[in-house]
Amino acid sequence: MSTTINVPVINNSKNPLPKYETTKAAGMDLRASLTNLSTKFLFNAYIESGKVIIEPRGRALIPTDLHMSIPEGYELQIRPRSGLALKYGITVLNTPGTIDAEKYF
C-alpha cells in the first residue's frame, strides 16, 4: 500500500525538480544549485570559476535552491551517491541528512 502526500515546492534553481531516474531507483537525484554560491558554509573549500573546490578533509554546504513545505511527522532524507564517495571521497557528513518540517533546503 502506498500513500500520496502533496508537498508544495518552490524551485528557485535552474535545475528540474528531483525525480526517479530509473524504474528501479530507490531515491530521487537531487542537484546542486551553483548560481549564487556563498562562502559562508565552506570549510577548507573555495569557489573557483563557478565551481566548488573541496580540499582534502574539507566540508561544504551546497545549496539546492529548493524550498518545500514538509508536513509534520514526515521527513526527507539526503544520502550520498555511492559513486561520488568511492571515486571522489565526497559524501554527506551526517548520513542520512534529515530534513523535517522545521527545515527546508
Identify the meaning behind each predicted range.
Residues M1-F105:
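DUTPase catalytic domain/fold
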